Regions:
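Short, conserved beta-strand element in jelly-roll/cupin
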Residues: 36-37, 47-64, 68, 175-191
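Asparagine-centered strand-capping/turn motif at beta-strand->loop junctions
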Residues: 91-96, 175, 184, 212-218
């Protein structure tokens, strides 16, 4: 799995609806993919049988279908978040004039853990795109650097501000606005017996972190991706 998926670390994958590329990867545990979906185009209606998936819309507006029925669709404007359980079919459509940009969080990383149920471009039941649909990432593409304690990173993507930070405790995290979105890139929030409450790939807001901080603790260091307007 790692050998096959790591091929995409330095590639842009060309899609009929736009493109995507790996903007960050933590070993084989977590992959963050940048998606650009053009206006009035959508991804296949697909699911991931083995991995947990989360999205943060960082620019534009998306229409996201959950499940097999179109009626189960909602609009998400930037910045907004969504967690998708293992095996749930979903599709994302760009409805803004300039399309939609999103970050996809996959746990664990496996590009080939993909089942396409329906597709506008004839890819139904077909696997993930191979090397014939990829090209080398250009220097103008944003790539997140390795997170280091005391060296926060900042990126402006569309109308969203993206920070990557490393925290030893909750002190600075819980002082953020309640609308702030956090994605966990590394580390864990655990209970008194060391059991995971929140781990890499989870996406939550400040309000949830405030409540969790009253009972649980950060194990070692927590690496977060923070998004706000």
């Amino acid at each position: 799995m790692r050998k096959k998926s790591s091929f995409y670390d330095n590639k842009v994958v060309i899609k009929p609806w736009g493109y995507e590329y790996t903007i960050y990867r933590h070993l084989n545990k977590l992959s963050v993919t940048f998606l650009k979906i053009n206006n009035n185009h959508r991804t296949s209606l697909h699911c991931h049988p083995k991995k947990k998936t989360g999205f943060i819309v960082i620019d534009g507006k998306a229409k996201i279908q959950l499940g097999l029925y179109k009626e189960n669709s909602e609009y998400f404007s930037s910045p907004s978040k969504l967690m998708i359980r293992t095996g749930l079919f979903h599709s994302i459509k760009g409805v803004s004039k300039n399309g939609v940009s999103a970050l996809e969080f996959e746990t664990p990383m496996d590009k080939h853990d993909l089942v396409r149920f329906k597709d506008d471009y004839g890819r139904r039941k077909k696997p993930y795109e191979g090397k014939n649909y990829s090209k080398k990432i250009g220097e103008n593409f944003i790539r997140f650097k390795k997170p280091l304690f005391g060296k926060d990173q900042f990126y402006k993507i569309g109308k969203s501000k993206v920070f990557i930070e490393v925290h030893k405790n909750f002190k600075k995290i819980i002082n953020k606005k309640n609308s702030t979105i956090f994605a966990i890139l590394g580390g864990k929030i655990v209970d008194g017996r060391g059991r995971n409450i929140i781990s890499y790939g989870d996406i939550i807001k400040t309000g949830t972190l405030k409540k969790l901080s009253q009972v649980f603790k950060i194990k070692d260091k927590l690496i977060v991706l923070r998004v706000l307007k």
